[in-house]
Amino acid sequence: MAVQTLHIHLVSDSTGETVHQVARACLAQFADVKIIEHVWTLVRTPAHLEALFEGLDRNPGILLMSIIDQNLRSSIEKTCRSKGVPAVSVLDPVVNMLTTVLGQAMTNLPGGQRRLDTAYFARMAAVDFAVSHDDGMNMSNLKKADMLIVGISRTSKTPTSMYLAHRGYKVANYALVPKVPFPQHYLDGLDLFVVGLTNDPKRLSQIRRTRQAAMQDNANEDYADIDQITDEVRNARRLFASNGWPVIDVTRRSVEETAAAILQYYTKWAETRS
């Protein structure tokens, strides 16, 4: 099948992250398509539309927008119709449903989700927490954590912690090291959600060898040894089972998928305590 080329114009009155993520999720369902993105952010006045319309003339394709101002949206929709450019407002279905269910009109505030409000500062605090509680640091401060991620080396603990932090969760993580007992005493007296991450030993060996090559580390031969890793995985699973912690196999999972699985377990855990 021949590869198709599609110009896609992503238009937003804020950072463009919302419309970009929607486009990314949808386009992932189509193969053999070469996507050329044209990003138009902070579009908030009629003057900003001139460059956009010129861009549509140069590279016609489709347009996805996240624009709150009704006048700007109307102008974009009218121009797109005249140019034969399909246009979709990605927020409309959800906003319309919420308007009906809640019985109130939207605020028409561009970039409303990025206001410097309490939730924003809570997310930033969560990021700071994840950084200062990475790889076993400050384990004595776990009483302030929402959750603890435990796993052997190279099971995506840090990136998963940071991803969840950007969702507002205070996450600590601990790396299991061969022949070093897990410091169980830090959990004494705490009602804390803990999840274990594991990986396929062969996959882990590949990842660790790649890391060693990148770091030019030839001293630790056991680090990527398949037998050593198999023992690490087995011992980690024993620890997880003995504590009754849920276990997630991150083999071939993206960080986003791992985080989603963690949140499923966390939600069920939290519901039993509400």
Which functions belong to the PLM regions below?
Residues D191-R208:
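Conserved phosphate-donor/acceptor-positioning beta-strand/loop module used by diverse small-molecule
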Residues M124-K170:
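Internal active-site segments that recognize and position negatively charged phosphoryl groups
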Residues R81-A122, I226-D231, R238:
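Ser/Thr/Gly-rich flexible loops in soluble cytosolic domains mediating phosphotransfer, phosphorylation
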Residues V11-S14, M65-Q70, R252:
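Structural motif
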Residues V39-I67:
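Metallocofactor- and cofactor-centric catalytic cores in central/energy metabolism, strongly enriched
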Residues M1-V22, C26:
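N-terminal accessory targeting/assembly segments
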Residues V171-F182:
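Short beta-strand-centered segment that lines the nucleotide-binding/catalytic pocket of NTP-utilizing
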Residues A130-M137, T210, D217-T258:
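Small-molecule kinase domains that catalyze NTP-dependent phosphoryl transfer to phosphate-bearing small molecules
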